[in-house]
Amino acid sequence: MTDLAHIRNFSIVAHIDHGKSTLADRLIQETGTVQDRDMKEQLLDAMDIERERGITIKANTVRIDYTADDGQAYVLNLIDTPGHVDFAYEVSRSMRAVEGSLLVVDSTQGVEAQTLANVYQAIDADHEIVPILNKIDLPASECDRVAEQIEDVIGIDASGAIRVSAKTGVGIHETLEAIVKHLPAPKGTRDAPLKAMLVDSWYDSYLGVIVLVRIMDGVLKKGMRVKFMSNGTLHHVDRIGVFRPAMQMIDSLGPGEIGFLTASIKQVRDTRVGDTITNDRNGTEVALPGFKPAQPVVFCGLFPVDSAEFEDLRDAIEKLALNDASFSYEMETSAALGFGFRCGFLGLLHLEVIRDRLEREYDIELITTAPSVVYHVFMKDGEMRELHNPADMPDLSKVDHIEEPRIKATILVPDEYLGDVLKLCQDRRGIQQDLSYAGSRAMVVYDLPLNEVVFDFYDRLKSVTKGYASFDYQLTGYREDSLVKMSILVNDEPVDALSTMVHRDRAEARGRAMCEKLKDLIPRHMFKIPIQAAIGGKVIARETLSALRKDVTAKCYGGDATRKRKLLDKQKAGKKKMRQFGKVDIPQEAFISALKMDS
């Protein structure tokens, strides 16, 4: 076990694409932790999708041995955290497991919204922060301006910021020295009862669930019985080890160290991020603060395009859920789309990642229904119901009021696009809370309904700002608003997959747009089809799809007009009967296009 004074635990904080994973690669390479022949780009990002999108989804860790210029041998534990807002809780737990952070800022881009969000989490966790200006090899690099911006926007001293090019390896040695000199050593007592924080967990088909832990007090030994404090379950520890990035087994972990344990645990659901692990006898009484189970925020239906693939989809979803405790699912059926699942996600990126993995790793074509958020429906009898699916909305006459989730959105944008961004937020029922400037960029803070953001807000924001805006949000709570369920009826039959919750003031415009879109997408039938948008029993928009018509009077030339009349009346009666019993086939493309519709 290593002496506490010679351990440094740190994480790297950065916006997407500012070079966090590349810097981690260089630190590993410089210290010889991995042989050059085993080295590859984004070494810590194991999933294909992490590599391809250049994002980090799971918190990864590596133990680095480093001999400093003062001749002392140090153990550096790096936790590579996700940078995206959907995984903010994983970030906050990883932050609590370490004592310092490297703040990486791209010297060509400057401070971005997610840099801010994660830096504030590091400051909340009382971290010592070392600023690093990356990409100094690029001609567009402006180190002095960006250092000034770090001081203005974040308020930490950046005069001694380390200038690095993670690509070419410049400044890597200085970074390692700064970690040893400026970051504090961990605290902890060897003789106290075991207290360890669960930082992350994932499923391995050979070892069962692998649990990443940071030891706060006490010692974790092989063969111990440990207790998970959130659910009281007991487990027998059969392996302990560290990552260099490959697994290396050891016998024990002491205070301040970060490693992993396996204990024949079957499901990731039993190991919750942020939980406290202790001895089963004479364990600690007080759990580590800040634990909360992950709550899904965005819900949507996933249906296979080919209904014969339903069982394959069930297997695939169960396998993904093994590895992702924040992903929830339950079966649902839809008259239009058949059997599928109602799934809960942490946010839109999480939804996209899961959907991509299902399509890519399990080769299943999917239809995704419109994403919706969790509403609180207060009934007149005082009961509060959580509404995950608009199709389950109770009868309006029994509803007292509905509350929707609100978010605090922080948007950083060059000032020439500010007007467009303000208009976009206003259109989405936003309330402006703050507007400040850092150099030539504006920072806007808005209170927005999450319902307006999950649909396509991010895409619209990127398009009105030519891709220059960066955006970050956090949930702030629930607030009452005038919300209604809008149903779409095709040939007087409600189509459950197209029902959505909308604000009363915007229902008519949204309903009209939806009806027009469906009119273009549904093929014509032998009878006319009304397409309607309705709130309760009141129709607020309607389009009529005209019938295909056969010319029944073609065989009559000349002769009596009553003969033609008789044939036309007979056709009319047939069409009326057909409309009564005829079934309208809505093609899959119509669903997909209607759901992708610009809100």
UniProtKB/Swiss-Prot annotation:
Binding of GTP, residues: D17, H18, G19, K20, S21, T22, N134, K135, I136, D137
Subcellular location: Cell inner membrane
Membrane topology, as annotated: Peripheral membrane protein
GO molecular function: GTP binding; GTPase activity; guanosine tetraphosphate binding; ribosome binding; translation elongation factor activity
Catalytic activity: GTP + H2O = GDP + phosphate + H(+)
Presence of keyword rRNA processing: no
Keywords: Cell inner membrane, Cell membrane, GTP-binding, Hydrolase, Membrane, Nucleotide-binding, Protein biosynthesis
Taxonomic superkingdom: Bacteria
Keyword flag Hydrolase: yes
UniProt-listed Pfam families: EFG_C, GTP_EFTU, GTP_EFTU_D2, LepA_C
Gene Ontology biological-process annotations: positive regulation of translation
tr-type G domain residues: 5-187
Gene Ontology CC terms, in alphabetical order: plasma membrane
EC nos: 3.6.5.n1
Major place of residence: membrane
Reported function: Required for accurate and efficient protein synthesis under certain stress conditions. May act as a fidelity factor of the translation reaction, by catalyzing a one-codon backward translocation of tRNAs on improperly translocated ribosomes. Back-translocation proceeds from a post-translocation (POST) complex to a pre-translocation (PRE) complex, thus giving elongation factor G a second chance to translocate the tRNAs correctly. Binds to ribosomes in a GTP-dependent manner.
Family per similarity comment: Belongs to the TRAFAC class translation factor GTPase superfamily. Classic translation factor GTPase family. LepA subfamily.
Protein name as catalogued: Elongation factor 4
Source organism of this protein record: Ruegeria pomeroyi (strain ATCC 700808 / DSM 15171 / DSS-3)
Lineage summary: Bacteria, Pseudomonadati, Pseudomonadota, Alphaproteobacteria, Rhodobacterales
